[in-house]
Amino acid sequence: SGGFDFSFLPQPPQEKHDGGRYYLGPGPMGLMGPRGPPGASGAPGPQGFQGPAGEPGEPGQTGPAGARGPAGPPGKAGGVVGPQGARGFPGTPGLPGFKGIRGHNGLDGLKGQPGAPGVKGEPGAPGENGTPGQTGARGLPGERGRVGAPGPAGARGSDGSVGPVGPAGPIGSAGPPGFPGAPGPKGELGPVGSTGPSGPAGPRGEQGLPGVSGPVGPPGNPGANGLTGAKGAAGLPGVAGAPGLPGPRARGLVGEPGPAGSKGESGGEPGSAGPQGPPGSSGEEGKRGPSGESGSTGPTGPPGLRGGPGSRAGVIGPAGARGASGPAGVRGRPGEPGLMGARGLPGSPGNVGPAGKEGPVGLPGIDGRPGPIGPAGARGEAGNIGFPGPKGPAGDPGKAGEKGAGNRGAPGPDGNNGAQGPPGLQGVQGGKGEQGPAGPPGFQGLPGPAGTTGEAGKPGERGIPGEFGLPGPAGPRGERGPPGESGAVGPSGAIGSRGPSGPPGPDGNKGEPGVVGAPGGSGGLPGERGAAGIPGGKGEKGETGLRGEVGTTGRDGARGAPGAVGAPGPAGATGDRGEAGAAGPAGPAGPRGSPGERGEVGPAGPNGFAGPAGAAGQPGAKGERGTKGPKGENGIVGPTGPVGSAGPAGPNGPAGPAGSRGDGGPPGATGFPGAAGRTGPPGPSGITGPPGPPGAAGKEGLRGPRGDQGPVGRGETGAGGPPGFTGEKGPSGEPGTAGPPGTAGPQGLLGAPGILGLPGSRGERGLPGVAGAVGEPGPLGIGPPGARGGRDGNPGSDGPPGRDGLPGHKGYAGNGPVGAAGAPGPHGVGPAGKHGNRGEPGPVGSVGPVGALGPRGPSGPQGIRGDKGEPGDKGPRGLPGLKGHNGLQGLPGLAGHHGDQGAPGPVGPAGPRGPAGPSGPAGKDGRTGHPGAVGPAGIRGSQGSQGPSGPPGPPGPPGPPGASGGGYDFGYEGDFYRA
């Protein structure tokens, strides 16, 4: 309590008071002693009160952006369009559809949230022109005009006290105008009075000349996408001949290639592309597979013209009839090896046919060199399958015969489908098309007639206000443009009758106390009204003077002539908007001004604040409800046909003239959703885009029905894999005749993509590939011929799959004709035989003539698997083998990225005007327009009628002192008065 705080000194270990503080009296401070030893810690003091909350901290800095998360699952269709998701990993791109023609713009609505990009659909059918809407209700009256110049100052009254207001006398005749008086002293400007309530609206003036159009305002905010038109009818897609399943291996060796066939004509028009699914998650990269086959190279068609984006995706039309396959074209250059796709589903193993009887042993070669192969013995009857006997001793390897040089045999009948082959090369992805507007979810009703939006008018100069003409139909709401410049002052109109009094202004500053006036005499003669002087500024309010005695009421003076109109004063501040008065009668329309030149488009400014909603217009006539079309039934999903080669893209038609944009019609009622239209004819395929990264392996989908067998195609020979283990020799088939080529089945409708399954386990190894040609002769064996070993065992079951070898050298394309596909042979049933012992490789004999290809014999029972032989030395690479069977249909790949946006195509012909859509909500107030040019002076307005008298205003400030009246001064109680 008034002492010093010694809490900073070390304290002895005694009880603390007041949280360790000691307060001394006001005595003098002693010298500081030596520092003592530190005391023991005291008991903890009581807990202090909680302090006030601290000031809020500064906002933290924005942290670094997190790593990009994985792509989310695809959203459900429908609902409000959401933001565009991150771009997924590209999948295998489908054939791009032909871009539709862009429809007309709909009415501008509120901008929706951007949604997931919809699939690009086919062009909608152009709608019909709508009827113009009814005239909207008359708009509210405009804002009040600016405050006029102040009127002339009144003459100074006498110094007498204010008497009661007498009755108004008759208005005398106006005298001659007096000379203007000398200007009074300029007072200080008082504060601006608040605007009072507005009086009733006066009669409308005559319509002024229209102002000159100002420059075009900035473009408005983009409206929502208009309603999409109904789908066009779908044409029948053309068919392309697809490669059929190849025939089984021929027993004979490959002969000399025949002459190249002429290039066949391409099939029909390609079918339209189905809708693209949502992007899936990225999958693991599959193993690198052998090279796919390169198709026949067709002539490069001219690049098609790009169409505008369609409004919505079309449904896939029914498959067209299969076109006849053209003759095989010249083989193209070998393609680059593609990435190996996911392993396909294992094919059902073929049934093994019964073992044939052994043929006679060939003649031994001369001098150990390979001799010619003897003629094939007649095929014996198939015997019953016996149980495998005991394993005999391994015989010496026989000598291989020389390679024959006979003609190539006719292709045999098709065998069973093998396991799925590796996917072929992916084409180059085409350029990204223009993104069409996101379609609304689901089918929408029949769109109303689309009003054409007029150009934004140029803001005119403010002319002399004329009378209101009949209101026209409400135009689209534009953005507020920049404020226009004030118009030139028009000629002064005739002085109208006195209007109602304005609201009372604020009190002026208080002035000095005035001198008390002497009692006035009774009934002085009224002086003439002087001419109006130049209006002076508003003086400060003086001090309230002593109230004089009430004088007798003077007579009304004669009304003076109206003074000269003073110079216009500065414009007052714009008052608040008054209440709307009653609408006056419509005046005659003034002459229409010449349209101004269109100004340059100004830069887009920020959005203005929303203004008050205008009066609701009359509802437009409700459009007639269209007849609901029958709902189409889904067709039966046909078997998946082979993919045809893409035809050349046709050129787009010439661009038609752009239609004019009409006025916006009234909002039409939303109709019921119409039936889905038929799919339009498919357009030519675009250029295939570059391959995307491989997608993840999907779940195994349901196996689709097997398609009809197509004609045999001949592709490039794939790269040879590593040599597998040699199986035992199977029985030779009986020679048969080549079957007729099978007929191509119709192309099935494209089914919906199946749900991607989890990656399945690795399936069994597929059927063995075609055997390669005989290699170069090996070293000659030494020794006498050994005894013949046991008979060849039945084919064993496949071993585990070997590792993929490096891609081998591609064979060169042959030029022989393609044989016709044979009819599939019957499936044999039986177990597989076991593997026999692998013999030592003998010398290679000369090749004998190729025998005729026999029909496929019935499969024998599968024998017991034999012991695995020792792998022999790797021989030189053989000739390219025959093409294997087409594999099973692979699972659909993930959807690929959209490519980069391509160059915009030429504008197509404008379609007919569609029906008007429903009116969107009112947009925000536009930005203030650019200042327009000064318009011509308007027509002089008519003189208005006298309005009702307003409330009396407050007393004005005291005027300047008047001229002396010839009185005399006298004193009264210390004050001087003048009589």
From Swiss-Prot:
<dbReference type="Pfam" id="PF01391">
    <property type="entry name" value="Collagen"/>
</dbReference>
<feature type="modified residue" description="4-hydroxyproline">
    <location>
        <position position="38"/>
    </location>
</feature>
<feature type="glycosylation site" description="O-linked (Gal...) hydroxylysine; alternate">
    <location>
        <position position="99"/>
    </location>
</feature>
<comment type="similarity">
    <text>Belongs to the fibrillar collagen family.</text>
</comment>
<feature type="modified residue" description="4-hydroxyproline">
    <location>
        <position position="10"/>
    </location>
</feature>
<feature type="compositionally biased region" description="Gly residues">
    <location>
        <begin position="710"/>
        <end position="724"/>
    </location>
</feature>
<comment type="subunit">
    <text>Trimers of one alpha 2(I) and two alpha 1(I) chains. Interacts (via C-terminus) with TMEM131 (via PapD-L domain); the interaction is direct and is involved in assembly and TRAPPIII ER-to-Golgi transport complex-dependent secretion of collagen.</text>
</comment>
<dbReference type="InterPro" id="IPR050149">
    <property type="entry name" value="Collagen_superfamily"/>
</dbReference>
<dbReference type="GO" id="GO:0030198">
    <property type="term" value="P:extracellular matrix organization"/>
</dbReference>
<feature type="compositionally biased region" description="Low complexity">
    <location>
        <begin position="840"/>
        <end position="855"/>
    </location>
</feature>
<feature type="compositionally biased region" description="Gly residues">
    <location>
        <begin position="778"/>
        <end position="788"/>
    </location>
</feature>
<feature type="compositionally biased region" description="Basic and acidic residues">
    <location>
        <begin position="865"/>
        <end position="876"/>
    </location>
</feature>
<keyword id="KW-0379">Hydroxylation</keyword>
<feature type="modified residue" description="4-hydroxyproline">
    <location>
        <position position="334"/>
    </location>
</feature>
<feature type="modified residue" description="4-hydroxyproline">
    <location>
        <position position="44"/>
    </location>
</feature>
<feature type="compositionally biased region" description="Basic and acidic residues">
    <location>
        <begin position="622"/>
        <end position="631"/>
    </location>
</feature>
<feature type="compositionally biased region" description="Low complexity">
    <location>
        <begin position="601"/>
        <end position="621"/>
    </location>
</feature>
<feature type="compositionally biased region" description="Low complexity">
    <location>
        <begin position="24"/>
        <end position="70"/>
    </location>
</feature>
<protein>
    <recommendedName>
        <fullName>Collagen alpha-2(I) chain</fullName>
    </recommendedName>
</protein>
<keyword id="KW-0964">Secreted</keyword>
<feature type="modified residue" description="4-hydroxyproline">
    <location>
        <position position="337"/>
    </location>
</feature>
<feature type="compositionally biased region" description="Gly residues">
    <location>
        <begin position="659"/>
        <end position="668"/>
    </location>
</feature>
<feature type="modified residue" description="4-hydroxyproline">
    <location>
        <position position="13"/>
    </location>
</feature>
<feature type="compositionally biased region" description="Gly residues">
    <location>
        <begin position="427"/>
        <end position="436"/>
    </location>
</feature>
<feature type="modified residue" description="5-hydroxylysine; alternate">
    <location>
        <position position="99"/>
    </location>
</feature>
<keyword id="KW-0272">Extracellular matrix</keyword>
<feature type="compositionally biased region" description="Pro residues">
    <location>
        <begin position="949"/>
        <end position="961"/>
    </location>
</feature>
<dbReference type="GO" id="GO:0030020">
    <property type="term" value="F:extracellular matrix structural constituent conferring tensile strength"/>
</dbReference>
<feature type="compositionally biased region" description="Low complexity">
    <location>
        <begin position="483"/>
        <end position="500"/>
    </location>
</feature>
<feature type="compositionally biased region" description="Low complexity">
    <location>
        <begin position="147"/>
        <end position="176"/>
    </location>
</feature>
<feature type="compositionally biased region" description="Low complexity">
    <location>
        <begin position="363"/>
        <end position="382"/>
    </location>
</feature>
<feature type="compositionally biased region" description="Low complexity">
    <location>
        <begin position="222"/>
        <end position="263"/>
    </location>
</feature>
<feature type="compositionally biased region" description="Gly residues">
    <location>
        <begin position="517"/>
        <end position="527"/>
    </location>
</feature>
<dbReference type="GO" id="GO:0031012">
    <property type="term" value="C:extracellular matrix"/>
</dbReference>
<dbReference type="InterPro" id="IPR008160">
    <property type="entry name" value="Collagen"/>
</dbReference>
<feature type="compositionally biased region" description="Low complexity">
    <location>
        <begin position="272"/>
        <end position="282"/>
    </location>
</feature>
<keyword id="KW-0325">Glycoprotein</keyword>
<feature type="compositionally biased region" description="Low complexity">
    <location>
        <begin position="639"/>
        <end position="649"/>
    </location>
</feature>
<feature type="compositionally biased region" description="Low complexity">
    <location>
        <begin position="767"/>
        <end position="777"/>
    </location>
</feature>
<feature type="compositionally biased region" description="Low complexity">
    <location>
        <begin position="669"/>
        <end position="679"/>
    </location>
</feature>
<feature type="compositionally biased region" description="Low complexity">
    <location>
        <begin position="550"/>
        <end position="594"/>
    </location>
</feature>
<feature type="region of interest" description="Disordered">
    <location>
        <begin position="1"/>
        <end position="979"/>
    </location>
</feature>
